[in-house]
Amino acid sequence: MAGLKNTPYNAVHWSQLAPEEQIRFWEDYEAGRATTFLVEPERKRTKRRRGEHSTKPKCENPSWYRPERYKALKGQLGHAYNRLVKKDPVTGEQSLRMRMSRHPFYVQKRTFVGRKYAFRPEKQRLLDAIWPVLVSFSDAGTHTVGMSVTRLAEEISPKDSEGHVIPELEVTVSRLSRLLAEQVRFGVLGVSEETMWDREHRQRLPRYVWITPAGWQMLGVDMVKLHEQQQKRLRESEIRQQLIREGVLREDEDISVHAARKRWYLQRSQDALKKRREKAAASKRANRLKKLPVDQQIYEMAEYLRKRLPPDEAYFCSDDHLKRLAIRELRQLELTLAAPPPH
C-alpha cells in the first residue's frame, strides 16, 4: 500500500485496462518497472509550451476622476460618486475614498461566479478605477452608462499632453470586457440584451452596460430616493416624448425602465450603423480619388458637395467657397494635397 500514496487521482487499476495494455503492464511489473497496481493514463501529447512573454497588463495602475470642467452630479448619483472619490480641500487633489474591489459583496458571492480566491492586484486596481467612470456617465433615468466598452477603455487609459491614448499604457478593450463580464455575473452590472450583427462590417455593434440595484446598494445610496429621481427623469426624458409623438404612449402614461433602456440602445445601434456606413462610403470615395491628380480630386469633390447642398445654399454658393469646402473635405479624408487651402 505504500506505493499508492503518490499515485495520481485519475489512475486506474490494472484490471480495468485493455487486454493488450494488461499484458504490457505485467511485463513491466515482472521487469521491475511497475511498482504499483494502479496505472497512470498516458498524458496527451501537446506542443503547447509556456511562452517567455510577460503577462503583465499594459496599464497596471489606472485611475480616473471627473475633470474640473464637468458639472457636479446631482441627487443620488452625486452621492454615489462622492462615496467613491474624495477631494483634498487644500490641494484639490482627488483620490479614492472607497475601493469597490474590497467590498464584502464580492466575498459573499465569490463562489456563485466560479471564483475561489480574491481579485488579483491588477484587477483590483482596474475595478477601483472603473466604478467612478460608470457612475459618472450613468444616465439618471435608465442608469445606463452612456459609453460603449471600447469608449470606456479609451476613457480610462492614460493620455499624453494632446489628449491621445498612449498605446504602450492603454487599457485594452479585451481586458476591460472580461472585467465587466465578470461584474455581470456578480449581478452588479447589466449588459444590453441584444447585440446586433453588422453584416457589412462583419462585427457586432457596441455593447453598453447599466448599473443594477445590487450595484447601487453596494455604493450605499438611498434606494427610495434613487427610484424617485429615476421616475422623475424618465417622465422628462426625450425617449418618452418621442413615444408620445409616435402615438405609442399617452400623455398620462409612464415609460418603464426596461422599455426606455431598450429604446435607448436601439437609437445608439442605429447611430452606430449610420456612422459606419458614412465611414465606409468615405473610405471608398477616398480610394477612388487618391488615384486622380490634385485638380481632379478638387473638382470631383466639389461636384459631389454641390449635389448634396440644400437648394438655397447651393444657389448662393460661389465657386471659390465650394472649392474651399472641397479642399476641407479632402483633408478630412486624409488625402495629401500639394497646396494649402486658400484663405
UniProtKB/Swiss-Prot annotation:
Gene giving rise to this polypeptide: repZ
Keyword terms, alphabetized: DNA replication, Plasmid
InterPro entries: Plasmid_replication_init_RepA
Protein name: Replication initiation protein
Species this protein is from: Escherichia coli
Described function: Probably functions as an initiator for the IncI1 ColIb-P9 replicon.
GO biological process, alphabetically ordered: DNA replication; plasmid maintenance
Start and end residues of each stretch annotated as Disordered: 42-61
DNA damage keyword on record: no
Origin: domain of life: Bacteria
Organism taxonomic ancestry: Bacteria, Pseudomonadati, Pseudomonadota, Gammaproteobacteria, Enterobacterales
